[in-house]
Regions:
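Concave beta-strand-loop units of leucine-rich repeat
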Residues: 3-18, 25-40, 46-62, 68-84, ...
């Protein structure tokens, strides 16, 4: 379909013998869905506007350039287990969900995106050893659960430039991670849910000052299991706090809890 330049919606699936999808003239599209497990060449280089959600599933592509596409607040879902490099523009105007199936990648890179105007979610990159995200600001929610199984990759999960999360932060199961680091993060405007289950080191939010906003009702839940969640500069929590600690087992005891500079919790503490 080399002459197609616009489509109200486009769905490609159950095409078992197709290895190439070429849409070199497509500049705008509504809902866009591709599910094709033999496609190793995918060309949407002219696409400028996505006016609906886009889902790419089971493609064999290894790189994807999104730097020219305006997602107009819509959601891009990527379920491609060989996709190891994504390049975006400075501002990503939409939601980005990275949800590969049966992924065995050991390396993954996301480049170029500094400002995420929607949600960012990433799950089930079991074997990736370094997961370093470039964001400075994320306007929506962040959800990270790279390892929900028993794979021992010793992953390093870092957001070295991130300063503010406009929504909620959820750090779920990142089992056997060596490091989870948000060194510049100052504010989480939504709720915060963090678990340290089976981590190899503490999680430290070294510059985090506040969780929630005065206008909202948020919840901070810290599930501390064998390793700590350190917030040395945290002063204000606009909402309730629920701290859960692991019981003593196999010679280990529940951890110490210390948030020395907290001045205000507007909700319940439990």
């Amino acid at each position: 379909m080399t002459e197609l330049y616009s489509a109200g919606g486009l769905t490609i699936k159950n095409c078992k013998e197709i290895s190439t999808i070429e849409l070199p003239g497509l500049t705008s599209c509504g809902e866009f869905s591709v599910d094709a497990n033999k496609v190793n060449k995918f060309n949407i280089s002219a696409l400028r506007d996505a006016f609906g959600n886009m889902t790419l599933s089971n493609l064999l592509i290894e790189e994807l350039d999104l730097s020219r596409i305006n997602f107009n607040g819509n959601t891009l879902t990527l379920q491609c287990n060989r996709l190891n490099k994504i390049v975006g523009s400075e501002t990503f105007n939409g939601n980005l969900l990275l949800l590969p199936k049966n992924c065995r990648l050991t390396e993954f890179t996301l480049e170029g995106i500094l400002n995420m105007q929607g949600n960012f979610e990433c799950k089930d990159y079991f074997y990736v050893k370094r997961f370093i995200m470039p964001f400075v600001n994320v306007a929506g929610d962040i959800t990270i659960a790279l390892n929900t199984g028993s794979v021992d990759t010793g992953a390093e999960i870092e957001f070295p430039k991130l300063q503010e999360i406009g929504g909620a932060l959820t750090l779920g199961k990142n089992i056997n991670a060596n490091k989870i680091d948000f060194p510049l993060l100052k504010r989480i405007l939504g709720s915060c849910s963090v678990t340290t289950s089976s981590l190899k080191d503490d999680i430290e939010f070294s510059n985090l000052e506040s969780i929630g906003t005065e206008a909202g009702s948020t919840q901070a839940e810290f599930n501390i299991n064998k390793t700590n969640i350190l917030c040395p500069k945290l002063k204000t929590i606009h909402g309730g706090v629920n701290i859960i600690t692991d019981v003593a087992m196999f010679g280990m005891t529940a951890n110490n809890i210390s948030y020395p500079n907290v001045e205000s919790i507007s909700g319940d503490l439990s």
